Amino acid sequence: MANNHSDRRVVVTGLGVVTPVGNDLNTFWQNLVAGQCGIDKILSFDASAFATQIAGEVKNFDPTPAFPSPKEIRRTDRYSQFGIYAAWSALQDSGL
């Protein structure tokens, strides 16, 4: 039983980002347009034991606005925080 979903429509109501070139839409877009590169020497830990010491790290990330309490932030791993913050930002951007 195959479903053809090509006739389904999607409405994008808001955008949210957490990236190496910006953690909010304005910063992200300005850095993207300016050709800013998010790849740099790894600063979040000592990478000298690894073959590669460069990466696209998310810097200056503060998940606080997207979480109800500091306890919830502590319970959530960093990468889930990125997703939750991006979804929260998209909701804020949507104006819903």
Q: What is the predicted function of each stretch?
A:
Residues 1-96:
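Conserved "HGTGT" condensation-loop signature of ketosynthase/thiolase-family condensing enzymes
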